[in-house]
């Protein structure tokens, strides 16, 4: 009888242990071709239901040696390079990331990243590179949208039209 309760307790606790794993996320968003603007602008509610990346979660990037090689002389322009730690769970919210001066509801670089745990981390990402007019109005957007499976500990390259993204996840 006690073994049955122990087994039930272990089954009940097992998903919770797996559900709150802490990961270090690092990404480099860069341009590798002439901007290819999307037919639609970034939506005003681009970060809907996403949790903003908190300053206290940010970490010093470890892939600076790679970002340093993405130079204009080589045909690249680094747009965003961030590193942070976050818990990853099945029902956790997406993380909203942005960079630059805010213009109404938008930033020059903005996006969301959602991670789901597993041997291969299911990752949904959407990033916009926005261009603004003289009065701060949104004129055009480039968009990178991907759903990929990532292997923790492996640097992954995502190619999309005029933009590219390098992302690495490490379990802490």
Can you describe what each PLM-predicted range is?
Residues 32, 168-172:
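Short beta-strand-to-coil "C-cap" segments at the C-terminal boundary of structured domains/repeats
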Residues 1, 59-65, 164-166:
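Contiguous hydrophobic segments
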């Amino acid at each position: 009888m006690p073994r049955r309760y122990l087994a039930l307790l272990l089954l009940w606790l097992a998903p919770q242990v797996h559900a709150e794993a802490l990961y270090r996320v690092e990404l480099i968003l860069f341009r590798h071709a002439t901007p290819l603007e999307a037919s639609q602008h970034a939506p005003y509610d681009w970060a809907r239901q996403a949790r903003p990346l908190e300053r206290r979660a940010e970490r010093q990037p470890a892939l600076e040696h790679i970002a340093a090689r993405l130079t204009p002389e080589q045909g690249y322009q680094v747009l965003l390079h961030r590193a942070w730690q976050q818990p990853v769970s099945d029902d956790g919210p997406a993380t909203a990331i942005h960079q630059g001066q805010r213009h109404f509801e938008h930033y020059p670089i903005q996006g969301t990243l959602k991670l789901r745990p597993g041997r291969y981390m299911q990752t949904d990402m959407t990033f916009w590179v926005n261009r603004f007019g003289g009065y701060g109005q949104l004129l055009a957007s480039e968009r990178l949208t991907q759903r990929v499976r990532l292997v923790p500990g492996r640097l992954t390259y995502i190619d999309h039209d005029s933009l590219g993204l390098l992302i690495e996840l490490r379990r802490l």
